Amino acid sequence: MTTFNIYPLDDSLRPTIQSKIDNLNKPKGSLGRLEELALQICLIEQTLSPTLHHPSHLLFGADHGIERERVSVSPREVTWQQMINFTRGGGGVNMFCRQYGFDLKIIDVGVDYDLSSIEGIISRKIAWGTNNFLHEAAMSQEEMEQALGIGRDMVDCCQKEGCQV
């Protein structure tokens, strides 16, 4: 079983941080989810003025077996095409990362296509897509543990590169 050492946030600064956010030159709560995110980042860093150091966005790609039931917006071919598109800077996520200075890591954990030779894609493939959960378990317990481990490893890698968010 995979365990993570994620400690509860120290809430002692919450009232002070919330007051600072509420008293910015804007209507209270007008930034919606962004205000919640700002509060969370301040609590993580335990400061009223957080800074992001080498922020990273991890994009994990995989195909889902239930797609075979035609319930997805797009066919599975779109997954590998989009993964390649992301390496060329053509996705919305690329624009976000460029705009805000985030490092983008594109990780293949289960795309039903061989992307191993594509520069810019980290190959950590567990399987060639998941099973159709309408008929069987989408993944085995072992595959699920492997997927969580890959996520943990990628976060560790980003942290070693100086990323704290």
State where each predicted segment sits.
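N-terminal loops that bind phosphate or other acidic moieties
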Residues: 1-165
